[in-house]
Swiss-Prot record:
Subcellular location(s) of the protein: Cytoplasm, Nucleoid
Oligomeric form and interacting partners: Homodimer.
Name of protein: Nucleoid-associated protein Cag_1190
Keywords from the named record: Cytoplasm, DNA-binding
Family matches, as InterPro entries: YbaB-like_sf (IPR036894), YbaB/EbfC (IPR004401)
GO molecular function, one term: DNA binding
Main location group: cytoplasm
Similarity field: Belongs to the YbaB/EbfC family.
Coiled-coil features, chain-numbered ranges: none
GO CC annotation, single: cytosol
Function: Binds to DNA and alters its conformation. May be involved in regulation of gene expression, nucleoid organization and DNA protection.
Pfam families named in the record: YbaB_DNA_bd
């Protein structure tokens, strides 16, 4: 049984590390949007799953419970869109070398 070439293994590890750094940079640049209530509440999140902005139509501010529900729905929609963008970007950057879902878990993103 042939032993794996240590040099090749080290090169693959180095390439994987470089790909991870590239993925991190790409995730920082990604922006995703979500909305609820027909656009009455809009959320924007980064590729690293951070809420960047939240816009609420002033006309709905009197209905506290509805605002709460719509904010949650809009943020969750934006987070879902962000995960999808991140998975797509990981696939592009790694050329299929890495499983996007597992990589996002390793980066503490996604579920």
């Amino acid at each position: 049984m042939a032993m794996p070439n240590l040099g090749d293994m080290m090169k693959q590890i180095q390439q994987a590390g470089e790909k991870m750094q590239e993925v991190q940079k790409q995730l920082e640049r990604l922006v995703a949007h979500g909305e609820a209530g027909g656009g009455m509440v809009k959320a924007t999140v980064s590729g690293k799953q951070k809420l960047l902005s939240l816009a609420i139509d002033p006309e709905i501010m009197d209905d506290y419970e509805m605002v709460q529900d719509l904010v949650v729905a809009a943020v969750n929609s934006a987070l879902d869109a962000s995960l999808k963008l991140a998975q797509d970007e990981i696939g592009k950057v790694t050329g299929g070398m890495m499983n996007p879902t597992e990589l996002l878990k390793n980066l503490n993103l996604g579920q």
